[in-house]
């Protein structure tokens, strides 16, 4: 039962990724124009970094997808919404369930890709924790304005997923740079 639920949710997530591809492409194009423009203004040599650009696009796609899945994109914001929201500071009120596993899985790619995008982020493991915690706290905060649940255990699981992805990325980066 739990496996079929997780499988269904993963396919739903993949479908969201596919549907948000054009939006992510537009955002990526804007980021590239700004990035190349800054390099041009600074009179730097404009480098074509295909792998870095691919990672940037995928990271934008992941961020947009997470914002859609969590209800930030498409949510109805309102002034009275924070009063209607439920904020839980109880840890694992419902136990360690499929939603907990999915939270971790959702944030693994979010933590994995920045290792290949941002210089020197991989040097300290706590960068992965900060990356996940800040983004997750931001999501939970905004969710209070759209009448959704905000839960402390979501922040913890999202941060754990980000850290797992970050550490996998660091390991892969270390393996690939040793071989060169």
Can you say where each PLM-predicted feature lies in the sequence?
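Bulky hydrophobic segments
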Residues: 1-152, 166-180
């Amino acid at each position: 039962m739990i496996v079929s639920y997780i499988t269904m949710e993963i396919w739903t997530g993949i479908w969201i990724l596919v549907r948000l591809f054009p939006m992510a492409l537009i955002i990526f194009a804007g980021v590239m124009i700004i990035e190349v423009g800054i390099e041009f203004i600074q009179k730097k040599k404009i480098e074509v970094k295909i792998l870095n650009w691919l990672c940037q696009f995928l990271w934008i796609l992941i961020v947009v997808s997470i914002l859609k899945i969590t209800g930030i994109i498409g949510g109805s914001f309102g002034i009275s919404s924070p009063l209607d929201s439920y904020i839980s500071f109880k840890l694992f009120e419902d136990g360690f369930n499929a939603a907990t596993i999915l939270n971790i899985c959702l944030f693994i790619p979010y933590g994995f890709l920045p290792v290949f995008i941002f210089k020197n982020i991989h040097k300290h493991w706590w960068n992965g924790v900060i990356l996940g915690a800040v983004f997750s706290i931001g999501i939970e905060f905004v969710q209070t304005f759209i009448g959704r649940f905000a839960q402390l255990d979501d922040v913890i699981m999202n941060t754990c997923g980000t850290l797992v992805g970050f550490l996998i990325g660091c390991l892969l980066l270390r393996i690939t740079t040793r071989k060169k």
